[in-house]
Amino acid sequence: MNYDFLIVGQGIAGSIMGLQLEKHNQRFLIVDKNEKITSSKVAAGLMHPMSFKRCVLNWKGETLYDYSHQFYTKCNEILSDKTYWEFPLVRLFQSYEEQNNWLSKVSTKQFVHVLSEREEKFDNINNPFGNGRLKKSAKLDVSAFLKNVKIHFERQNNFREESFSTQNIKKDGYFYKKGNDLFKYIIFCQGPFFDEFNPFSYLPIIPNKGEILEIQSEFLPQFILSKGVFSIPTVEDKFILGATYNHNDLSRKITEDARLELLSKVKKFLPQNNFKIINQKYGFRPTTIDRKPLIGNHPILKNAFIFNGMGSKSILMAPLLGKQLIEHILFNKKLSEGVNVSRFDHYFSAQHKELCSKLVT
């Protein structure tokens, strides 16, 4: 069968890429081997435009948030299930300095639509320096969203659950051939781990391990709380607590160190006897050395693209950046400054060039 696009991977990036291609009436196929543990499947689903550490907006934070909010709201309708909704987030200040910094920005032009001076009152939370509430915050039930996307595309014969190897791809004139299928373009959305034959294996993607706790507590409020860690309500009196960030640990298991780190942070605002641990999970985020996404064209395989490297902000970034990549491919529009994968072309060696020539001949 002839397709316009092959999408490799059905995590957050691949799912959103499929939904964006659907808007453009493109013929596409998503392939994914359905690994049990991925960063997308254990993602907490928190979305907001802020970097709390310095009380600044993330890179293009408000623009990305506004577009993503519209995108996921529409997805609720398309997928016939509400997996996304706006949800109040309260920042518990860690010092009077942070409190003053927040309040000084509330009425400024840059933050007037993002920060609120409203303070919430909590009976069971240690909150000596006060708190502030975001005007823009939301959560996505990532597991349910991915499941719904898979079902949606299975019904349209746009999804196959199978493993993928670049060794099975051959060049057939203008097209890429996989089995009996032909594709004009390939978009790799595979997360942090590449096999040695992947044409984008030259890129400096850094797996960043994150671990979360699932806890139960009758004392936590039905708000997203942030103070060193986040607490996100899920169902009834259950919450997700997270997350850790570790570039060095590549072990595929949960760790005691991560559990202790999360407990030490949550105890700063919630006494340990006020909650119990139900479960612990881990995943690996795809991060980059300059903390910017990896989006764009392969140096020599001109119809091969990558959509990756969004780390813990894929829920925030992927909708708008996915739209930009599709418009870049179809209409030759420019990508956002700083995300184009061409900034790492100097990593592409003669050895990588030889590998790519073997893959497509």
Can you name each region flagged by the protein language model?
Residues M1-A13:
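Beta1/beta-strand and adjacent pyrophosphate-binding region of the FAD-binding site
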Residues L6-V8, D181-F193, G322:
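Short hydrophobic core segments
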Residues A13-H24, L46, S51, K82-W85, ...:
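Active-site substrate-recognition segment that forms the wall
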Residues E22-K41:
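Glycine-rich FAD pyrophosphate-binding loop
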Residues G45-N124, P128:
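Dinucleotide-binding Rossmann-like beta1-alpha1 core, especially the glycine-rich loop
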Residues C55-Y67, E97, G132-N148, K253-A258, ...:
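Short beta-strand to alpha-helix junction loop
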Residues G132-Y185, C189:
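Helical element adjacent to the flavin cofactor pocket in flavoenzyme catalytic cores
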Residues I278-T361:
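C-terminal catalytic lobe of FAD-dependent flavoproteins
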